[in-house]
């Protein structure tokens, strides 16, 4: 599974500005989803890869980004 990293309290994606390989996105994806996750910046949001199937990614149901 893969998808955008989401802030559970706001419902917003984690923003990034350096597209492609991005240390910030990689670190944040691994912190939230574990060491096996990958991450890079895609369309100005942190995109996480190699996630477990139950991983929660953006968009959150019933929670819009404010």
Swiss-Prot record:
| Record domain LCN-type CS-alpha/beta: where | 1-66
| Residues annotated as signal peptide | none
Q: Which Pfam families match?
A: Toxin_3
Compartments where located: Secreted
List the coiled-coil residues.
none
Q: Which residues carry this modification: Asparagine amide?
A: 66
* Record has Secreted as a keyword: yes
Q: Does the keyword Disulfide bond apply?
A: yes
Sorted alphabetically, which keywords does the UniProt record give? Amidation, Disulfide bond, Ion channel impairing toxin, Neurotoxin, Secreted, Toxin, Voltage-gated sodium channel impairing toxin
Entries under InterPro entries matching the protein: LCN-type_CS_alpha_beta_dom, Scorpion_toxin-like, Scorpion_toxin-like_sf, Scorpion_toxinL, Scorpion_toxinL/defensin
Tissue specificity statement from the Swiss-Prot or TrEMBL entry: Expressed by the venom gland.
Cysteines engaged in disulfide bonds, as pairs: 12-65, 16-41, 25-46, 29-48
The cross-references to PROSITE patterns, in alphabetical order and at most eight, read: LCN_CSAB
Q: Which domain of life is it from?
A: Eukaryota
* Domain characteristics, as noted in the entry: Has the structural arrangement of an alpha-helix connected to antiparallel beta-sheets by disulfide bonds (CS-alpha/beta).
Q: Tell me, what does this protein do in biology?
A: Beta toxins bind voltage independently at site-4 of sodium channels (Nav) and shift the activation voltage toward more negative potentials, thereby affecting sodium channel activation CC and promoting spontaneous and repetitive firing.
Sequence similarity: Belongs to the long (4 C-C) scorpion toxin superfamily. Sodium channel inhibitor family. Beta subfamily.
**What name does the UniProt record give this protein?**
Beta-toxin ChFII.7
**Source species of the chain:** Centruroides hirsutipalpus
């Amino acid at each position: 599974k893969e998808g955008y990293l989401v802030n559970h309290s706001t419902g917003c994606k984690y923003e990034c500005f350096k597209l492609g390989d991005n240390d910030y996105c990689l670190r944040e994806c691994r912190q939230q989803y574990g060491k096996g996750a990958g991450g890079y910046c895609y369309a100005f949001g942190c995109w996480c890869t190699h996630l477990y199937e139950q991983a929660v990614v953006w968009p959150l149901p019933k929670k819009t980004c404010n």
